Design a protein with these regions (language model features):
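N-terminal lobe of the biotin/lipoate ligase/transferase fold
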Residues: 1-89, 110, 124
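Solvent-exposed residues in well-ordered beta-strands and their adjoining turns
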Residues: 61-65, 115, 130
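Acidic (Asp/Glu) carboxylate-rich active-site/surface patches
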Residues: 79-122, 129
Length: 130
């Protein structure tokens, strides 16, 4: 599967940019990435601090299959893949706090936030990973 990678140095939010990208008909699937977010949001729309060049801020955009259980599976899959990658690549003690929070040495460092937006593109899924 071929992905489009769209990288920015600074965005208000990768989620906002992903919605704009999908509504303008950008090729899917696509990964929208930023080195910094000035208005990132977490669960329940809470503000999310995104400092310069110290994190991974991204939103994955793809056509959603008709599957009611997809969001829970994506949430779990993103968390497991993130933790396994952190452990393997960096040798750090990463853990999952059910179901979407990723902890390093007892402190929350990331979360996955699958969400669904119909936008103007029918059946488009926006999924913020980590």
């Amino acid at each position: 599967m071929k992905f489009e990678f769209v990288r920015f140095s600074d965005l208000t939010s990768t989620n906002d940019e992903a919605k704009k990208y999908a509504s303008e008909g950008g090729p899917l699937p696509a990964l929208i990435m930023a080195e910094r977010q000035s208005a990132g949001r977490g669960r329940l729309g809470r503000s999310f601090y995104s400092s310069d060049n110290t994190g991974l801020y991204m939103t994955l955009v793809f056509k959603a299959p008709d599957d009611d259980g997809l969001f829970l599976r994506l949430t779990c899959l993103a968390a497991v893949c993130s933790v396994e990658s952190i452990r393997e690549l960096f040798g750090l003690k990463a853990e999952i706090k059910w179901v979407n929070d990723i902890f390093l040495y007892g402190k929350k460092r990331a979360e996955s936030l699958p969400s669904h937006s119909l936008l103007t593109v029918k059946n488009t899924l926006l999924s913020a990973l980590v």
